[in-house]
Amino acid sequence: MNERIFRENTRPVQVGNLTIGGSEELTIQSMTTTKTHDVEATVAEIHRLEEVGCQIVRVACPDERAANALSAIKKRIHIPLVADIHFDYRLALKAIDAGVDKIRINPGNIGRRDRVEKVVNAAKAKNIPIRIGVNAGSLEKKIIQKYGYPTAEGMVESALDHIKILEDLDFYDIIVSLKASDVNLAIEAYDKASRAFNYPLHLGITESGTQFAGGIKSAAGLGAILSLGIGNTLRVSLSADPVEEIKVAREVLKSFGLSSNAAMLISCPTCGRIEIDLIRIANEVENYIATIKAPIKVAVLGCAVNGPGEAREADIGIAGSNGEGLLFRHGKIIRKVPEAIMVEELKKEIDILAEEYFEKKTDLESLR
C-alpha cells in the first residue's frame, strides 16, 4: 500500500471529546450562519447540524457580545465548539474563559508577542488547541511581496511562520488549515504542508460557491486531497444552509470509505428498461438513510438487468420488476414484494441491519 494513502503520523490533538489526528477517523465540521450573540438562534442551528452528522461546529466571534454568548451556547450543545477569532486577542481570552473547545486564530494578526503569549498561556492552562487558519486570499504582505501572488509555497511558509510563533511559546496543540478557492492551489498547498509538518490538517476549499456548484467544486478538491491520504478534519464551505455542508461532506467521506458511521446509497442510472419510479424511490431512500449512523450499503435498482447481481456488494437492496420488487441481501434474493410496499419493506430491512450493527458494536465495546 502506498505510504501516502494513510497519513497516520499526525500529532493527535484533543478537541473536546474528539481526537483529531493520529489514526483517528476524519471529522466533519461546519460553521453557523447566525449572529453568535443570538443564543437561541445559534443553538437551534447547531442542533440541526448535530442531527445530520456535524461533529465540530465553529462560530464567529467578532465582538464582545458574541464572546459573552459562548458559555451559554456551549452548555446547550453536544459537540465541540470552536470560536473564530480575528485581530482582538481579548476576544480569544474571553472565548477560552467561556470554555470553548478550540480557537481559530492567526497568531500573526493578534498583535504583539505579549498578546499572543497571553492567548497561548490561557489555552495551555485549559488544554485548548489552536487552529492556524491560512487563507490564500489574506496572506501577509511579506509573503505576497516574496512570491508575487498566492502560491502553495507561500501558504506553507505562512503556516510555518505561525507555527513557529506557537512552538517558541512551547505550545504544540496545533491544527492547521491552508484554504484557497482555487482547487489546484489548495491541493498543492495541502500536499506540501503534509510533508512539511506533522500537525493535523483541517481541509477546505474556501468560497467554493452555491449549494450545487460549490458542492461539486468542494468534492473535486477535497476528493483529490483525500486520495493522497491527507486530512484529519474537513469543512465543505457553501453559500447555503450549513446542513447542506454536512450532507456533502458525509458523501465525500463515504465515497473514499472514510466514514464508518454512515449509510451509503447505490442507485442505477435511469434508462428505458426502468420498471419502477426509480427517481422518487431513490430520493426517498436516500432521505431515510441520511441520519442512520451505521455503515450500511443500500441499493435501489430500476430493473432486473442491473440487480441484484450488479449490486451484490450492497448489504440490502431492491430491484424493480413488473410491478413488484426483488428484495435482496448481498446479491441473494430474499423475497418478492409488491411495488406499493417495497420501499417500506426495504426500510424495515435497513432498520434490522442497523440494529444488528449497533448490537455487535455494543458487544465489542463491552469486551474492551
UniProtKB/Swiss-Prot annotation:
Pathway: Isoprenoid biosynthesis; isopentenyl diphosphate biosynthesis via DXP pathway; isopentenyl diphosphate from 1-deoxy-D-xylulose 5-phosphate: step 5/6. It comes from the Bacteria. GO terms for biological process: isopentenyl diphosphate biosynthetic process, methylerythritol 4-phosphate pathway; terpenoid biosynthetic process. [4Fe-4S] cluster binds at residues 268, 271, 303, 310. It catalyses: (2E)-4-hydroxy-3-methylbut-2-enyl diphosphate + oxidized [flavodoxin] + H2O + 2 H(+) = 2-C-methyl-D-erythritol 2,4-cyclic diphosphate + reduced [flavodoxin]. GO terms for molecular function: 4 iron, 4 sulfur cluster binding; 4-hydroxy-3-methylbut-2-en-1-yl diphosphate synthase activity (ferredoxin); 4-hydroxy-3-methylbut-2-enyl-diphosphate synthase activity (flavodoxin); iron ion binding. Its cofactor is [4Fe-4S] cluster. Binds 1 [4Fe-4S] cluster. Keywords: 4Fe-4S, Iron, Iron-sulfur, Isoprene biosynthesis, Metal-binding, Oxidoreductase. Its EC number is 1.17.7.3. Converts 2C-methyl-D-erythritol 2,4-cyclodiphosphate (ME-2,4cPP) into 1-hydroxy-2-methyl-2-(E)-butenyl 4-diphosphate. Belongs to the IspG family. This is 4-hydroxy-3-methylbut-2-en-1-yl diphosphate synthase (flavodoxin). It comes from Listeria monocytogenes serotype 4b (strain CLIP80459). The lineage of its organism: Bacteria, Bacillati, Bacillota, Bacilli, Bacillales.
